[in-house]
Curated annotation (Swiss-Prot):
Keywords: Amino-acid biosynthesis, Aminotransferase, Histidine biosynthesis, Pyridoxal phosphate, Transferase. It comes from Mycobacterium leprae (strain TN). GO terms for biological process: L-histidine biosynthetic process. Its EC number is 2.6.1.9. It catalyses: L-histidinol phosphate + 2-oxoglutarate = 3-(imidazol-4-yl)-2-oxopropyl phosphate + L-glutamate. The gene is hisC. This is Histidinol-phosphate aminotransferase. GO terms for molecular function: histidinol-phosphate transaminase activity; pyridoxal phosphate binding.
């Protein structure tokens, strides 16, 4: 008897998962990948050799569980952040996990959940509502200004009126690229009833001071999350972390799975941190390339949202999906983030950006492009 292959509809899924699609950017084999905001500069030979040696050293103990609390890695992260932000931090201020998404999930497991709510200011990072849904946290949202910047007055009012347990702010914001000032964060923190999560995935690119500066000032209200997947060029290593007061770090111990960070991940990440200066040396070059791309797009007649990250949001296309397909047909993969009329492009290597700009100039001569020169917003 042949039994039909079951589908998702045949499974006893939770109701809130029915009809959903898995999250994830396209992974296609094309010459130019500018869709996931990675650092395009590969690791140095010295870093690769260090990772190999470090992993080889722990491999003899792979029959044993790793350090459950990743103390040595967290100490290294604290030292890195102290040097990077100028704010003295210790191991007690740091928590680490498999990418910043796991960090965000743990935060909502601890501070969200059934009967609680989280608010975001859209468009922003699309995983925030997905993680809220996955933890049964009610998702609330307020729309950003027409230029995609955060309307702080509206945000303060929304938080004061709706009293969410968790507030999400991405700075720089993905997909628009704007950062928020410490003064504006203080205004929000003064009305936040629960915790404010400042998602600094692109923090190393930002021209503004890190929100880490506010941890001592608002010890029970603020958590800063970061990743090594962007400027730090360690996307394949899958490491995210948070910075907070020790009590908030302790809360993560209540929800984290035991031995969640493998000994291989911990060893490789510690090796990568030893080469932080070399890796982050590419940030200035990427910012310069971002500005070159921005000026070129504006010259072609596109509207470009000023960015403080390693990507640009640009438009306004009459048919964003058609424009995205044209880029792909020329071997350039960028991101359609679902904002009508806009696409997002990662800043790549100079030759990758040249290919992107060539495709952009072709689109500028078609009916897909803006009808008039709008310039930077």
């Amino acid at each position: 008897m042949n039994v039909p292959e079951p589908t998702l509809d045949d499974l006893p899924l939770r109701d809130n998962l029915r009809g959903k699609s898995p999250y994830g950017a396209m992974q296609l084999l094309v010459p130019v990948l500018l869709n996931t905001n990675e650092n395009p500069h590969p690791p140095t030979k010295a870093l690769v050799d260090d990772v190999v040696r470090s992993v080889q050293k722990v491999a003899v103990d792979l029959h044993r569980y790793p350090d459950r609390d990743a103390v040595a890695l967290r100490q290294d992260l604290a030292s890195y952040l102290t040097a990077q932000t100028g704010i003295r931090l210790g191991v007690e201020n740091i928590w680490a996990a498999n990418g910043s998404n796991e960090i965000l999930q743990q935060l909502l497991q601890a501070f969200g959940g059934p009967g609680r709510s989280a608010i975001g200011f859209v468009p922003s990072y699309s995983m925030h509502p997905i993680i809220a849904d996955g933890t049964h946290t009610e998702w609330l949202e307020t729309v950003r200004a027409d230029d995609f910047s955060l309307d702080v007055e509206a945000a303060v009012t929304a938080v004061a009126d709706r009293k969410p347990d968790v507030v999400f702010i991405a700075s720089p914001n993905n997909p628009s690229g704007q950062s928020i000032s410490l003064a504006d964060l203080r205004r929000l923190l003064d009305v936040v009833p629960g915790i404010l999560i400042v998602d600094e995935a692109y923090g190393e690119f930002s021209s503004r001071p890190s929100a880490v500066a506010l941890v001592g000032e608002y010890p029970t209200k603020i958590v800063v999350t970061r990743t090594t997947s962007k400027a730090f060029a360690f996307a394949g290593g899958r490491l995210g972390y948070l910075i907070a007061t020790p009590a908030l770090v302790e809360a993560m111990l209540l929800v984290r799975l035991p031995y969640h960070l493998s000994s291989v991940t911990q060893a490789a990440a510690r090796a990568a941190l030893r080469h932080a200066d070399d890796t982050l040396g590419s940030v200035a070059a990427l910012i310069a390339e971002r500005e070159r791309v921005t000026k070129s797009l504006v010259h072609m007649g596109f509207r470009v949202i000023p960015s403080d990250a390693n990507f640009v949001l640009f438009g306004h296309f009459s048919d964003a999906a058609g424009a995205w397909q044209h880029y792909l047909d020329t071997g350039v993969l960028i991101r359609d983030v679902g904002i009508p009329g806009y696409l997002r492009a990662t800043t790549g290597l100079a030759e990758e950006n040249d290919a992107f700009l060539k495709a952009s100039s072709e689109i500028a001569a078609t009916e897909l492009a803006p009808a008039t020169t709008l310039g930077a917003s």
